[in-house]
C-alpha cells in the first residue's frame, strides 16, 4: 500500500483519437504525436524514460526498459471537457453530459444583465477562440462597456472583459449570476471569467481567470476520502472543478510553474494517507486552444525538466500518477478540446514497470486510489493492480 498518492493532470495532453472521435469532429487528433511531428522533435528524456513512448500508438520514441508502468485510458463520459474528465478520474461518469450551445437564448442574456443591473447589451454570443474574440471585439467592448460572451464545443459560458472597463469584482459578479441561471435545460458545465488588459491590437488575457463550476452530480472519490478521514490537497483549479467538495486543503495556483512548485512543497511536508491532486493548466489554456504546437511542446519540455525534482521529493511509500483529462491538439482546424485517449504513467519505488494496456475508463484511477487506502472496491473502474 502507498501512504501518499500524487496525481498530476497534464491538462489537454491527449495521445490519439478515440474510436468515436468522428462524432466530435476530431478525426486525426493526436496531441502528443502531432506536436512531435510538427516540431520535428520533442525533448522529453524523463517522460520517455518512464515509458511515455511505449504507450500504444504514442508516435513517440520508446525505450527498452521503462521505469514506470504505462498505458492509456479511454473516456467513458460522452464529452471532452475539463469538468467531465476530472470527475471521471475521480470515479463519476456524468450521463447525460452537460449541454453545449452554438449560442445562448436572448431571453437568458437579457435576464442575466437585468439581474446584474447592467444595460441589456452584449457582444459575441457564439463559439470562438478566447484570444481571437477579444482581438475582434475588444475595441468595441472598450467603447460600449458591453461584456463579451462566447462559448466553444465544450459546455462553457465565457465572459471576457477588459479589467479597466469592467472591474474584476463586477466580472466575477456577472459570472456568479450566470452560474445561477444556467441550470435545468440550460445546464452548462462551467461559467468562466476571462479578464484581459492592453490596447487594441495588443490585448492580453490575465491570470485572473476564475471558473464557476457546479458540484459533481454524483459521489466522487474525493467525497469518499473525506468521509474516511483521508487528507486531500487540490493544487491549481481542482477546487473549482469540484466546487471545493471533498478537497480539504487548497493551493489555488494559476500556472504550471507555481503548480509544480506547490506539488513539490506538498510532497516535502504532507503526511501519510494523503492524495495530492494537481492540475497543470498551461498546456491547454495557453497553447492548445491557441493552436500553438511549438509553445505546447516547449511547455511539455519545461515540465519534463522539472519532473526529476518531483520524483526526488517522493518517499519510498509514495505513488506518482501522470495522466490527462482530454486532448487539446494544437494542430487541428478548430481551437476546442479533442476527443482522445489520455496517457497513463504510474511511478514509485514499489511499482513494477509494466504495460497497463488500454483502460476503458478514467475511473480506473479512482478505483486504484480507493483500493490503495484500504477502502475496498470503487463502484466503477478497475484498480491498476
What positions do the PLM features span?
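Feature captures the catalytic ectodomains and active-site-proximal regions of enzymes
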Residues: 1-385
